[in-house]
């Protein structure tokens, strides 16, 4: 039930009222009427959050509960799950949300056990980030059980709420009755048009990996498009759009990297370029690759841009694949275009078969096992830190860097982009144009695809506003380009220093 006296007291003190009814055992229509009757005369009731594991009216009377909510103009609000992915399970809630066309509120809170472990500053930061990045419009601030910095429990709690409020106000957020996202479904014709664009991207990239004549490409494009459109019409459309969103997330960075390889090959037979020109081209090609990959991000946002995904009642499937597959496909494309394996390019069926046989039968030194183990550890961290939830803990130093970036930039860029991917890709271009060893260029290229793929994967988190995803990629590109330039300068300095010392040794001899 609901305490009418408490609700009235909250309203009398000038606050908005959020009610949290508990479901009845063997609930009846009379029980529901009783709950809402107790709300009569109480002003500013701006949301209902169910307590416990059941929605009010579950399992059979949730339609009646929803009707009473509409009648009293009270928004339905779901509780974000502890892992920050979708919602806490409450029987009947998902069905009610679907009938409301997913136009519901989303509340974020911190578990009391977790609150004990973090500072008030960290708690305020978590509420701030949750609100701006995950479509949170309701905050449930728990109270600290003990005071901090010689303050009372109440003052400590008020202080961290105040810090969160100040941060949000600086971002332009207003406080009061929370806005509820209206139902939004894009025009089906525009979705189909975007889907055909994603199919065209798929065919375009596949033919760069498996060469095919123009007429075969056209047949593949029109055939796949026809089947996809039929599936879209016959079904609700969610599954087929998810498939092509996943395809875009993989093919866009792969296509960007292959096009970049084709540009590199233009300089394959030429003499090493000057260091300055190679540096300028490294920056230029990074920007071009990022813009190409952004096509995939726009396709994802357009295909899955509806309230069901915004409010995370449906999520992008295959996030980890968007990190692994681009690396594998780019590795294949590289071996097709550059003579890395024993001075040969693997660009035919015969060469591919020969490569497999030679690879599986080659002699392996003992140290290779340590190298493979190290690469496996890197892959574990890389994949484990990706996706909607992270399975690898984040070190304290990185958390400090994240908080700094969150407070100084519009959207915190991803470390794998501006620390690893973008600088590595710039150095890969520089390495090729300066005729460095092929193995170094190959490894830098694989590291470079991480940043480009991560830029596209950012758009797979549909709960984050698309403009923020764009700015996250832009900020990462900006910092990554600066770090890439510094990396190239540092490498050039080390090479010059090495040559100078070698020349001195020769002179002394």
Please describe what each predicted stretch is:
Residues 6, 10, 35-39, 43-44, ...:
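Charge-biased, low-complexity intrinsically disordered regions
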Residues 88-96, 188-201, 453-456:
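Substrate-binding cleft/loops of secretory-pathway carbohydrate-active enzymes
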Residues 1-188:
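Soluble extramembrane regions of membrane proteins in the secretory/endomembrane system
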């Amino acid at each position: 039930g609901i305490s009418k006296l408490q609700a009235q007291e909250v309203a009398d003190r000038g606050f908005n009222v959020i009610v949290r009814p508990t479901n009845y055992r063997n609930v009846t229509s009379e029980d529901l009427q009783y709950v809402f009757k107790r709300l009569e005369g109480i002003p500013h009731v701006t949301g209902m959050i169910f307590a416990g594991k059941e929605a009010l009216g579950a399992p059979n009377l949730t339609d009646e509960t929803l009707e009473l909510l509409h009648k009293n103009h009270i928004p339905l609000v779901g509780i974000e799950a502890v892992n920050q992915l979708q919602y806490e399970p409450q029987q009947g809630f998902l069905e009610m949300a679907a009938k409301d066309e997913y136009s519901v509120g989303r509340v974020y809170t911190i578990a009391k056990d977790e609150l004990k472990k973090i500072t008030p500053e960290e708690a305020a930061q978590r509420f701030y980030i949750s609100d701006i990045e995950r479509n949170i419009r309701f905050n449930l601030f728990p109270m600290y059980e003990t005071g901090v910095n010689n303050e009372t429990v109440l003052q400590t709690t008020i202080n961290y709420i105040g810090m969160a409020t100040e941060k949000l106000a600086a971002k332009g957020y207003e406080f009061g009755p929370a806005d509820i996202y209206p139902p939004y479904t894009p025009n089906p014709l525009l979705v189909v048009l975007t889907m055909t664009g994603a199919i065209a991207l798929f065919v375009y990239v596949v033919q760069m990996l498996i060469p095919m004549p123009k007429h075969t490409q056209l047949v593949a494009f029109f055939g796949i498009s026809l089947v996809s459109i039929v599936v879209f019409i016959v079904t609700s459309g969610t599954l087929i759009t998810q498939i092509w969103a996943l395809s875009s997330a993989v093919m866009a960075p792969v296509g960007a990297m292959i096009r970049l390889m084709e540009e590199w090959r233009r300089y394959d037979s030429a003499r090493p370029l000057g260091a300055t020109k190679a540096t300028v081209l490294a920056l230029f090609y990074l920007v071009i690759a990022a813009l190409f990959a952004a096509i995939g991000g726009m396709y994802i946002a357009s295909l899955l841009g509806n309230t069901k995904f915004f409010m995370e009642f449906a999520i992008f499937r295959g996030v980890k694949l968007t990190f692994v597959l681009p690396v594998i496909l780019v590795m294949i494309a590289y071996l097709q275009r550059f003579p890395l394996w024993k001075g040969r390019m693997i660009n035919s069926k015969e060469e591919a078969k020969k490569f497999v046989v030679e690879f599986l039968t080659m002699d392996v030194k003992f140290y290779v096992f340590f190298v493979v183990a190290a690469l496996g550890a890197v892959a574990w961290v890389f994949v484990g830190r990706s996706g909607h939830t992270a399975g690898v803990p984040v070190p304290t130093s990185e958390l400090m860097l994240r908080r700094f970036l969150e407070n100084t930039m519009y959207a915190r860029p991803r470390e794998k982009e501006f620390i690893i991917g973008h600088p590595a890709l710039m150095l890969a271009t520089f390495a090729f144009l300066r005729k460095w060893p092929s193995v170094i260029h190959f490894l830098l290229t694989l590291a470079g695809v991480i940043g480009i793929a991560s830029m596209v994967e950012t758009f797979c988190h549909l709960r984050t506003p698309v403009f923020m995803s764009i700015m996250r990629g832009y900020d990462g590109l900006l910092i990554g380009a600066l770090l890439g330039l510094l990396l190239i300068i540092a490498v050039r300095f080390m090479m010059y220093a090495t040559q100078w010392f070698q020349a001195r040794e020769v002179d002394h001899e």
